């Protein structure tokens, strides 16, 4: 069995998690291939001393891997998706962060859950990705032009609102006068969109969510649309540029550029461990049922 390992930041709280993962897989003769920057950081911290194979930080994995394990929070998983792309290699998130809707494996029961991996006692779920094209062409979106959580447009270098002219399948929807606009997948519905008043979608729902950020018109509410919709955006504002973010990757775009957003023809696979369901995660992370009056 060959497993890719990726992590982004090193904190003292992650040290026992990293040690447990490496000790477990080494004792079970699992071949680990580590993202090169993460491995260098582990060498610097003297957490590992053994030589390991690496994979580069700017390329995709091939399908020879059983899975990619992400050590960190949800942000780390979103970055890890860039290594997976359309390879079909599933992602497993081990939560060394805080909230963790995607990184569901908790450090308290890590040995049991890693044994599920060894025994291949897991399933996978598919997550929709959003692809982005920009006219005129923007170099920033040449390769990593997809998002697992959301595509967001927002104002830049100004406190003034922007206007986001929005079309669905070439039919005019609205011109949002707001701080920005979020186009979210079901996976991203528990992220930025949720904090702006958007609904929660279960991962298997075939829909997207359009959520305005602090709209001037309070009747501009979040909208759920079919996931086969092509969304076209044209942004104007007082500044010459605005910001476009694909999950955690952010770039400046010229006003009047045309953005086209639609789901990609491939999906990301997420590893689902027995007992760690989406509904259980919702209850635990959002503290549903904690009010004893219920």
Curated annotation (Swiss-Prot):
Name the reaction it catalyses.
NAD(+) + ATP = ADP + NADP(+) + H(+)
SUPFAM superfamilies (alphabetical) = NAD kinase/diacylglycerol kinase-like
- Its domain of life? Bacteria
Q: Which Pfam families match?
A: NAD_kinase, NAD_kinase_C
Which positions are catalytic residues?
74 (proton acceptor)
Q: Where in the cell is it found?
A: Cytoplasm
InterPro entries assigned: ATP-NAD_kinase_N (IPR017438), ATP-NAD_kinase_PpnK-typ_C (IPR017437), NAD/diacylglycerol_kinase_sf (IPR016064), NADK (IPR002504)
Gene Ontology biological process terms, A to Z: NAD metabolic process; NADP biosynthetic process
Stored Gene3D superfamilies: Probable inorganic polyphosphate/atp-NAD kinase, domain 1, Probable inorganic polyphosphate/atp-NAD kinase, domain 2
Instruction: State where NAD(+) binds.
Output: 74-75, 79, 149-150, 179, 190-195, 214
The Gene Ontology terms for molecular function here are: ATP binding; metal ion binding; NAD binding; NAD+ kinase activity
Q: What is its EC number?
A: 2.7.1.23
- Cofactor(s) listed: a divalent metal cation
Identify the keywords attached in UniProt to this record, alphabetized: ATP-binding, Cytoplasm, Kinase, NAD, NADP, Nucleotide-binding, Transferase
**Any single Gene Ontology cellular-component annotation:** cytoplasm
Main localization (coarse): cytoplasm
Q: Tell me, in a sentence or two, what this protein's role is.
A: Involved in the regulation of the intracellular balance of NAD and NADP, and is a key enzyme in the biosynthesis of NADP. Catalyzes specifically the phosphorylation on 2'-hydroxyl of the adenosine moiety of NAD to yield NADP.
Q: Which family does it belong to?
A: Belongs to the NAD kinase family.
User: What is the name of the protein in this document?
Assistant: NAD kinase
Source organism phylogeny = Bacteria, Pseudomonadati, Bacteroidota, Flavobacteriia, Flavobacteriales
């Amino acid at each position: 069995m060959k497993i890719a390992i990726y992590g982004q930041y090193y904190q003292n709280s992650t040290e026992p998690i990293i040690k447990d993962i490496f000790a477990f897989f080494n004792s079970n003769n699992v071949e680990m291939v580590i993202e090169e920057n993460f491995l260098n950081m582990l060498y610097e911290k003297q957490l590992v001393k053994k030589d390991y194979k690496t994979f580069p930080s700017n390329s995709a994995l091939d399908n020879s891997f059983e899975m990619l394990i992400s050590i960190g929070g949800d942000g780390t998983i979103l970055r890890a998706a860039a290594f997976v792309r359309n390879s079909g290699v599933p992602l497993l998130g081990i939560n060394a962060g805080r909230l963790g809707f995607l990184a569901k494996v908790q450090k308290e029961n890590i040995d049991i859950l890693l044994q599920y991996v060894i025994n291949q006692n897991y399933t996978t779920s598919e997550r929709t990705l959003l692809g982005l094209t920009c006219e005129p062409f923007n170099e920033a979106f040449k390769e990593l032009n997809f998002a697992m959580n959301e595509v967001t447009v927002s104002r830049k270098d100004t406190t003034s609102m922007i206007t986001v002219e929005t079309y669905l399948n070439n039919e005019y929807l609205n011109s949002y006068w707001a701080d920005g606009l979020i186009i979210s997948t079901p996976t991203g519905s528990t992220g930025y969109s949720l904090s702006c008043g958007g609904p929660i979608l279960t991962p298997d729902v075939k829909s997207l969510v359009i959520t305005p950020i602090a709209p001037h018109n309070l009747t501009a509410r979040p909208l759920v649309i079919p996931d086969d919709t092509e969304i076209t955006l044209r942004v104007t504002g007082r500044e010459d540029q605005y910001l476009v973010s694909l999950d955690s990757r952010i770039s400046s775009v010229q006003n009047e550029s045309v953005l086209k957003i639609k789901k990609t023809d491939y999906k990301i696979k997420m590893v689902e461990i027995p007992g760690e369901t989406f509904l259980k995660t919702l209850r635990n992370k959002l503290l549903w049922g904690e009010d004893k009056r219920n």
